[in-house]
Amino acid sequence: MHIRILGSAAGGGFPQWNCNCRNCRGVRDGSVAAQPRTQSSIALSDDGERWILCNASPDIRAQIAAFPALQPARRPRDTAIGAIVLLDSQIDHTTGLLSLREGCPHEVWCTQMVHQDLSEGFPLFPMLSHWNGGLRHRPIALDGEPFAIPACPRLRFTAIPLRSSAPPYSPHRGDPHPGDNIGLFVEDLDSAGALFYAPGLGEVDEALLEWMRRADCLLVDGTLWRDDEMLVCEVGDKLGRQMGHLAQSGPGGMLEVLAKVPAARKVLIHINNTNPILDTASAERAELDASGIEVAWDGMHIQL
């Protein structure tokens, strides 16, 4: 299984266009040892030729340009993207569908709750129906059974409902439903390698830990270092848990969770611009390094 990190930042990217926190200011003027990042999205493949896009970032055009495998140029109009999987209906995970309209129709796999949000609150499905057939919904069930996507037939996907939050525009924001957010457990039938992918993760219970323990690689929510980070940095008024993100530090935080899991690789993705782990010289980054936890970067390639 080929895993390409197209974008590794949280919503707004890094640096965020209107943010002057220490990290954003520092990456602009060179005073912080960090590299810019686009908004989170990954691509998966079983053969390195046909790819499945997991979430469609607002930065998708630049991400495709930075990864030539997604543009094989076999004909006047071409793409190696064979399907799209949406793990939620967040703006920073779905807006890229608008930039992909010239390639419609697209097979879009998502839960019923995500499809509802993208048909009513943020109506991408009806809007894009005017472009060559638009988005063809392929429902993702929450029954725990693995499913295949024809674009990459040697991969098996299992959707795992997560405890997180629907986007602010959703009619049921603050009223969680199964399917608002999912994680993916992806297995390669040939190599037997397994990935657990959850860029938006608010809580981890024992059932979810069992899925994580089965994976060779964890690619999980790295949004915030501390739960009150947005308040401390004076850039927001919400705690991480209110936004559906489990902070890395503190009791029950992501670092404690990952210490319980034997995966060969543990990688944080969807990293907010305020998070000190973006600074490679920070004490927080050193703590991750000592724990064997990696920080995803745009262009990172993992093979299982």
From Swiss-Prot:
The chain's coiled-coil residues are: none
Record keywords, A-Z: PQQ biosynthesis, Transport
The job of this chain, per UniProt, is described as:
May be involved in the transport of PQQ or its precursor to the periplasm.
InterPro entries named in the record: Metallo-B-lactamas (IPR001279), PQQ_synth_PqqB (IPR011842), RibonucZ/Hydroxyglut_hydro (IPR036866)
State the similarity comment: Belongs to the PqqB family.
The record's Pfam families line, in alphabetical order, gives: Lactamase_B_2 (PF12706)
Annotated pathway: Cofactor biosynthesis; pyrroloquinoline quinone biosynthesis
Look up and give the organism this protein is from. Pseudomonas aeruginosa (strain ATCC 15692 / DSM 22644 / CIP 104116 / JCM 14847 / LMG 12228 / 1C / PRS 101 / PAO1)
Name the domain of life this protein comes from.
Bacteria
Q: A GO term (biological process) for this protein? A: pyrroloquinoline quinone biosynthetic process
Q: State the name under which the record lists this protein.
A: Coenzyme PQQ synthesis protein B
Source gene? pqqB
What Gene3D superfamilies does the entry give? Ribonuclease Z/Hydroxyacylglutathione hydrolase-like (3.60.15.10)
Which CDD domains does the entry link to? PQQB-like_MBL-fold
